[in-house]
Every structure is written in C-alpha cells, then in structure tokens.
C-alpha cells in the first residue's frame, strides 16, 4: 500500500469479509442441531463481527476501526451486547466478581452467560452483519469515487 486511503480501502474490504463470515457461520448454525457446533459457530460469528469495530493498527493510519455510525440505531443495544460477549468471554476475561456465581467445589457460572450460545441474538447478529456490510459497501464506493 502506498497511501492512507488505500489502507482504509483494504481495511474496509477485510471488514466485508468479516461480515460475510458472520453470515456463513449463522447459516451453518441454522443448519445443525449439534449444540457444541452451534456454540463454536456462534463464537466465530461474534468474534468476526466485532473484529473490525475493535482497534486495529495500520501503517499510515494509527487506528483502523469501523465507526459506530455504521451500526443502525435500532440495533445499537444488540451491537453493544455482542461486543460485551466478545470482550468478556471470547477475547478476554473481563469479568467482575459480581458476575461469577460459584457452586460446590471449583465449579462456577457467569451471571447472564450461563450458556454461551445465545439463540436470541442470532437474528439481530444476522441483521447487523447485513446492514454493516451494506454500509461498508457505501463507504468503499465513496473512497473509490474520491480516488485511491
């Protein structure tokens, strides 16, 4: 890459791939009854969705990150919940002591995340991926129109 706008364009293209991966993982979830596979695919979808919204480093642009304005207002709460699941359980262990529920012995659960596969988030995650994908396409068109 030779220019900052080319770097942003490449980042946007990679972000499109992430949204497509989300949709592919959800398609696979909808086609299986295997609970373990559903959890693994859900984890993949969540991580792939949040990745471009996290802080990525560029050569020309110190931070490459999708902007919040690409998330539809009506799905903002679900977006934040999905980011929280990724940050607290999948990518990091950012749990507070209040969230941990200890049982007998060494077993414990995480309050609110008793089961990692949250089927109620499948449709919102699918909608988010589709709408963010469309918004990224618009952003990429603008970048191309203004010249790489």
Map each language-model feature to its residues.
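Amphipathic alpha-helical interface segments
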Residues: 1-81, 101-148
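Short amphipathic alpha-helical segments with coiled-coil-like heptad repeat character
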Residues: 91-103
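Long, charged low-complexity segments
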Residues: 84-92
